[in-house]
Amino acid sequence: MPEFLTVVSWPFLILLSFQVRVVAGAPQPWHCAPCTAERLELCPPVPASCPEISRPAGCGCCPTCALPLGAACGVATARCAQGLSCRALPGEPRPLHALTRGQGACVLEPAAPATSSLSGSQHEEAKAAVASEDELAESPEMTEEQLLDSFHLMAPSREDQPILWNAISTYSSMRAREITDLKKWKEPCQRELYKVLERLAAAQQKAGDEIYKFYLPNCNKNGFYHSKQCETSLDGEAGLCWCVYPWSGKKIPGSLETRGDPNCHQYFNVQN
């Protein structure tokens, strides 16, 4: 497993941020790695036929061609064109989960008027996709996995840099107020989260180099590990992913580390 600073699971951080206000005067948040001239020189050219150039998603530096109406999209894909937003497909049972896997579609933004290029049926589908996401956001029964997906939609970017640092400040505030419910977490991934919070709270007080890569435990709603684990990168390069045993978080022997999908399900297929 890569030796990077480990950070806490995002669902837990999101829950903390809803419970306690962020400490005033918190240290500066971690930033995306700067787009140096050397990095920009490595960017592939945008095709001349591209109708609209879009800024990169997340911490990327290279401009991309904006996605058109109806194109597949997600958290890690290029951005949708102006007037469009990336939404889960109508009827998708796990909208946020689908968006983290690039299984959404570019549709008209809720406030955007329909255009002549969009048929009546397409317009209704676009509205249905928006409605499904709105209903999910209002549901009081959001699971921890959905909260994880929700955070990935707010992954660190040049527009949203304070999320991680503010969450750590929130934890420090809880500690100062002697809120000790954190110690009730018993499952393996949950225990790791608590230890990581302790380390991050301490690291917050120290000055040093910027952190551009870190591993964040990917926990399920029961407090165990998802079989697929990935590092998070703030330098524009895709992080490594690998496969683990859900009950321990230990890497599966012989499994690959890749910047794509390691296909962890292959190690759990039951042979008949």
From Swiss-Prot:
Q: What is its main location?
A: secreted
GO cellular component terms given for this protein: extracellular space; Golgi apparatus
Q: Which SMART domains match?
A: IB, TY
Keywords in alphabetical order: Disulfide bond, Growth factor binding, Phosphoprotein, Secreted, Signal
Residue ranges of every copy of the IGFBP N-terminal domain listed in the record: 28-109
- What is the protein's name according to its record? Insulin-like growth factor-binding protein 1
Which residues are modified to Phosphotyrosine?
A: 171
Disulfide bonds, paired cysteine numbers = 32-59, 35-61, 43-62, 50-65, 73-86, 80-106, 189-219, 230-241, 243-264
Which organism's genome codes for this protein? Rattus norvegicus
What broad taxonomic lineage does this protein's source fall under? Eukaryota, Metazoa, Chordata, Craniata, Vertebrata
Spell out which residues are annotated as carrying Phosphoserine. 139, 157, 169, 255
Q: Which GO terms describe its biological process?
A: glucose metabolic process; insulin receptor signaling pathway; phosphatidylinositol-mediated signaling; positive regulation of cell growth; regulation of insulin-like growth factor receptor signaling pathway; response to insulin; tissue regeneration
Q: Which residues form the signal peptide?
A: 1-25
Region Disordered, annotated ranges:
115-143
What exactly does this protein do?
Answer: Multifunctional protein that plays a critical role in regulating the availability of IGFs such as IGF1 and IGF2 to their receptors and thereby regulates IGF-mediated cellular processes including cell migration, proliferation, differentiation or apoptosis in a cell-type specific manner. Also plays a positive role in cell migration by interacting with integrin ITGA5:ITGB1 through its RGD motif. Mechanistically, binding to integrins leads to activation of focal adhesion kinase/PTK2 and stimulation of the mitogen-activated protein kinase (MAPK) pathway.
Name of the gene encoding the protein in the UniProt record: Igfbp1
Matching entries from InterPro entries are given as: Growth_fac_rcpt_cys_sf (IPR009030), IGFBP-like (IPR000867), IGFBP1 (IPR022322), IGFBP_1-6_chordata (IPR022321), Insulin_GF-bd_Cys-rich_CS (IPR017891), Thyroglobulin_1 (IPR000716), Thyroglobulin_1_sf (IPR036857)
Q: Name one GO molecular function term.
A: insulin-like growth factor II binding
The record's listing under SUPFAM superfamilies reads:
Growth factor receptor domain, Thyroglobulin type-1 domain
